[in-house]
Amino acid sequence: MRNLLENIKKNSQKLLNLTPKDKEKIILKLAQILRENFKIILEANKKDMANFTKSGAMKDRLLLDEKRILALCEGLEKIAYIEDPIGKISKGWKNYAGLSIQKMSIPLGLICVIYEARPSLSAEIAALMIKSSNACVFKGGSEAKFTNEAIFTLVNKVLKEFDLQDCFAMFTQRDEILQILAFDDLIDVIIPRGSSNMIQEIANNTKIPLIKQNKGLCHAFVDQSANLDMALKIILNAKCQRVSVCNALETLLIHEKIAKNFISLLIPEFEKFKVKIHAHENALAYFNNSNLKIFKANENTFDTEWLDFALSVKLVKDCDEAIEHINKHSSLHSETIISNDASNIAKFQRLINSSCIYANASTRFSDGGEFGFGGEVGISTSKLHARGPMGIEDICTYKYIINGEGQIRE
């Protein structure tokens, strides 16, 4: 294992020698080969889906169909045309001694990405790594074994064409990843995408820095001044469009003075999707005449990521109480306020600590593609290095370039 990782680290220099046009060409070729061979990917995915016996969020994340593969290819093409971040000078100045000092972007180095389900990441991450000149080792979940292998085989064909096959590796066995976690002298950072238990297990077994994507415990607060038609549209999109994703809504906070009117609008729409309601005792009565399944909230309700047609609901007396609740229970992912009160919006966006804070928009936009990044390595809920959807610039770091004319420090 050490020899393999040392070889990847050594060969990563090839990525630094790629021109922006080289990278564009490689990534476009990657999109092309995936599009031309989508049936191979679908066949592999059918095997994984047949072997996967659980239902719910992970099954949806595991699924690939023609539409999702074509969307993946379109995302890769967007990545291809994004400005190359490497070698970019973000600032420059001269110091008192006349030294020219510049801050230049560089790759993080050798990145390990560990992910559950989501086999499309095998291609998306490869494109992002090529664009940012990072070497990478991949570890996909066993539930997506056949799909990951099919996609990475196609990725590797493109890498071989450009003599980059030694800059990347995919691992499929659990014991291999446990070995990798020991090489903090070779791997620069780990980006885990999966359950809280998986992320915690990795953190407990390595000294390598992690950029974490915690669970997506996303909140919405419908303020007293909200346009209720707008609020209804946003809540339905955030909760019901795709429940298996980390930017889906999990907790709804409603100003107590509009609770009756707004919940009466919500109920018939939620009945269409059979949304299960986990209501705080102050909200229970408002759902009594509905055909929804209603549960009284317990001590764990507001810390639960449902990843299902289920929603925690609580009434609050004002924006301050909403902010206090969110900061207590949030996973630091995405939160939204629906309001026409500019001061409450400003307060909400200033005082909440999460990585993405919306006003009058759905949390479903927390995504690298939606942010214009082309794709994402993950959505970081960490506070160090990167936060929110991680595009190409977020898997770069920097160094200082200093040029002089014989200066010495007196």
From Swiss-Prot:
Biological process according to GO: L-proline biosynthetic process
Pathway(s) this gene product operates in, as recorded in its UniProt entry: Amino-acid biosynthesis; L-proline biosynthesis; L-glutamate 5-semialdehyde from L-glutamate: step 2/2
Presence of keyword Transport: no
GO molecular function, one term: glutamate-5-semialdehyde dehydrogenase activity
Keywords: Amino-acid biosynthesis, Cytoplasm, NADP, Oxidoreductase, Proline biosynthesis
Substrates-to-products reaction catalysed: L-glutamate 5-semialdehyde + phosphate + NADP(+) = L-glutamyl 5-phosphate + NADPH + H(+)
GO CC field: cytoplasm
Localisation per UniProt entry: Cytoplasm
InterPro entries in UniProt: Ald_DH/histidinol_DH (IPR016161), Ald_DH_C (IPR016163), Ald_DH_N (IPR016162), Aldehyde_DH_dom (IPR015590), G-glutamylP_reductase_CS (IPR020593), Glu-5-SA_DH (IPR012134), GPR_dom (IPR000965)
Its EC number(s): 1.2.1.41
CDD domains: ALDH_F18-19_ProA-GPR (cd07079)
Keyword Amino-acid biosynthesis: yes
Main localization, broad class: cytoplasm
UniProt similarity note: Belongs to the gamma-glutamyl phosphate reductase family.
NCBIfam families cross-referenced by the UniProt entry: PRK00197.1, proA
Main function: Catalyzes the NADPH-dependent reduction of L-glutamate 5-phosphate into L-glutamate 5-semialdehyde and phosphate. The product spontaneously undergoes cyclization to form 1-pyrroline-5-carboxylate.
Entry protein name: Gamma-glutamyl phosphate reductase
Native source species: Campylobacter jejuni subsp. jejuni serotype O:2 (strain ATCC 700819 / NCTC 11168)
